């Protein structure tokens, strides 16, 4: 199962962690994993390479973590909308492919120094 945890700060999604496998097909032929991977990369690249919003991004074996560095900044306003769109996209995939994606939202406090 793919596990997607979104981070909420001050009524907005400010980050996410995605890990796991959908198990909806053989390795390399799992359309759900492909859809989620593509959406994760599009979201991360849009935030960092096109919106230039500061974000901590960690990509590891079977896991991606992205957290906005300053969620209150003007540059992060659009990035929060992109994360919200990604959340909605995963909800749609999860509804179509039941039992393949678990989505949770965790409340977080402001980062230290804020």
Model-derived regions, located:
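N-terminal intrinsically disordered, cationic/polar leader segments
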Residues: 1-29, 41, 45-114
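Short, conserved glycine- and acidic-residue-centered signature motifs
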Residues: 32-36
């Amino acid at each position: 199962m793919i596990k997607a945890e979104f981070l909420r700060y001050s009524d907005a999604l400010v980050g996410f962690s995605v890990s796991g496998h959908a198990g909806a097909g053989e390795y390399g032929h799992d359309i759900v994993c492909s859809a989620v991977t593509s959406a994760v990369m599009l979201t991360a690249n849009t935030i960092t390479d096109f919106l230039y919003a500061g974000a901590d991004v960690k990509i590891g074996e079977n896991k991606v973590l992205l957290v906005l560095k300053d969620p209150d900044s003007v540059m992060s306003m659009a990035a929060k909308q992109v994360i919200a769109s990604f959340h909605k996209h995963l909800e749609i995939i999860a509804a179509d492919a039941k039992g393949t994606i678990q989505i949770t939202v965790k409340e977080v406090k402001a980062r230290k120094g804020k």
